[in-house]
Structures are given as structure tokens and as C-alpha cells.
A protein has these predicted regions:
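Glycine-rich flexible loops
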Residues: 1-271
């Protein structure tokens, strides 16, 4: 058996949940390649990651749009947790509002129980008073500034897609048309890029690159709306699971270049 301990039940559960996730991830990674562990330098880099110090403000009013986004985001976060796409404290969701501000999930709040009032409003680079937003807030802000077509961002750690993040095996979405239409040409960036090279990470996204994978870290999916980004997250995990399962049967036959061109033409996909 396994025994874990911490100062409270939440801490102990979080450790156990993470332990189980890592074990399953290693098993799946071994099915497609050789898992790559973090170096001591990378561990120290992650540990030195600073929390963004933002000025605070007190919102004068919460609009009906904002309230609706808060409710929808909680619903999607709970759904992602039930599907094991995120963990109790791992996984960041954000949604841009029509005035350019955005709502983001808080730091260190259990994703299984997060409520609308827990979510954090970021406006003009300032943080809603009395709340602690995700450590990736600046990355979300930069992506929104660089890409007016992006209105929602999700950072997650799903078991199957992460098998590609911890190995040197490339993720290829050309399995079935839906996978390619949703995910197009996913890019892989080095560990730590999302907080040491924020601008470069943000500039990696494009209509043909809606998903970025960070080595030994996470995946980032973007969309025109929260449900659109969530669809991409689900499709990415389903596709990764299919590839890993099929790899045990033989060579995988991907959609060829001519078929890809036809899909791009028929569905008016942009570069």
C-alpha cells in the first residue's frame, strides 16, 4: 500500500492524488518512449518561480457578463476535475471579458470545490482585492494582448497528453479529421519557458497553433471561448490516449499531406 501524510486532510489528499497521477503518467510514457525526468537545475528553477506582485483594486460593480463567466468557468473546472484533466490545485482557466479584463482561477484553491466568488478579476494589470490569482496570470495577460482572437486559455496536466510532454516523442494530431481541425499543429517548448520566456511563449500561438506543450510541465490550449478551449483540451487528451493505445497494435496510419490540405480547404482553416 501507500501511506502519505501532511498537516491536514487536503494536503495529504493532494500528495496522494499527485503521486497516483505521476505513476500513471510514467506507465503511459513508457509505452511510447523513455520518460525524461527533471534535472536538479530545473527543479531549482521551478522552486524559484516568483508570484506576480500585482496592484489591487476593488471592483465597483460585477456585470451580468462577468457573473455568467464566473458560473460557466466553475462548471468547466468541475467538469475537468471529474474527467481527471486537472488536479485538486493544478490547472488554470481564464476567460476574457468584453472590456478587455479577464477572469482567472485562484492560486491554491481546490478545483473540485472552487466557487464563482473564488475566481479573480484582472483588469488593467491589477488584481481584484483580497484574492490571489494563478501564478501564470502574466502569461495569460500577455497571450490576450498578443492575440485578440483568443478569448480563453486553459493550462492543464492530463495523463495521456503529458506522456508526450515527458518524452521526446512528438504529438501528431493527424489521426482523425476532428483531432486535426481542433488541434492543428501543436508545438513543444522547453521546460520553464512559460515563466522565463513569457513573451516568446505567447507569440508561439497562432490560428494554426492553438495548443502548446511544455516539456515536463503542462499543456496550454486556447480558444475563441471557454467551451471552445475546453473542447480542444478534451480532444487533445482523447487523441493522445488513442495514439498510445494504438501504438501497442502496430504502426499508426496518419492523415496524409494531401488529405490535410483538403481538410484545411473544406473547413476554411487559417494559418
Amino acid at each position: 500500500g501507500v501511506v502519505v501524510g501532511d498537516k491536514d486532510m487536503f494536503g495529504a489528499f493532494m500528495i496522494f492524488e499527485t503521486f497516483e497521477h505521476c505513476a500513471k503518467l510514467q506507465v503511459d510514457a513508457l509505452r511510447i518512449g523513455q520518460p525524461r525526468g527533471l534535472t536538479q537545475q530545473q527543479i531549482e528553477l521551478s522552486g524559484s518561480r516568483s508570484y506576480p506582485m500585482l496592484e489591487t483594486f476593488v471592483p465597483k460593480v460585477h456585470t451580468s457578463e462577468e457573473k455568467a463567466v464566473r458560473r460557466e468557468m466553475c462548471h468547466m473546472v468541475h467538469r475537468a476535475y471529474r474527467q481527471r484533466l486537472i488536479g485538486s490545485t493544478q490547472g488554470t482557466f481564464s476567460q476574457r471579458l468584453s472590456d478587455g479584463s479577464f477572469i482567472i482561477t485562484p492560486y491554491w484553491v481546490d478545483r473540485a470545490y472552487v466557487e464563482p466568488e473564488d475566481l479573480v478579476l484582472i483588469k488593467n494589470g491589477r488584481c481584484e482585492d483580497g484574492k490571489k490569482p494563478s501564478r501564470s496570470t502574466i502569461l495569460h495577460k500577455t497571450i490576450y494582448e498578443k492575440h485578440p482572437e483568443i478569448n480563453s486559455i486553459i493550462i492543464a496536466y492530463p495523463q495521456y497528453i503529458m506522456a508526450f510532454a515527458v518524452t521526446d516523442v512528438d504529438f501528431d494530431a493527424r489521426t482523425i479529421p476532428e483531432s486535426y481541425i481542433q488541434l492543428r499543429n501543436a508545438k513543444k517548448l522547453p521546460f520553464g519557458y512559460s515563466f522565463t520566456n513569457i513573451l516568446e511563449t505567447a507569440e508561439t500561438f497562432a490560428p494554426s497553433v492553438p495548443m502548446v506543450m511544455l516539456e515536463n510541465d503542462s499543456i496550454i490550449v486556447t480558444g475563441s471561448s471557454l467551451i471552445n478551449a475546453f473542447d480542444k483540451l478534451e480532444v487533445a487528451e482523447f487523441t493522445a490516449r488513442s495514439i498510445i493505445s494504438c501504438s501497442q497494435l502496430g504502426d499508426i496510419v496518419m492523415i496524409n499531406d494531401e488529405e490535410v490540405k483538403q481538410i484545411e480547404k473544406d473547413f476554411h482553416l487559417e494559418d
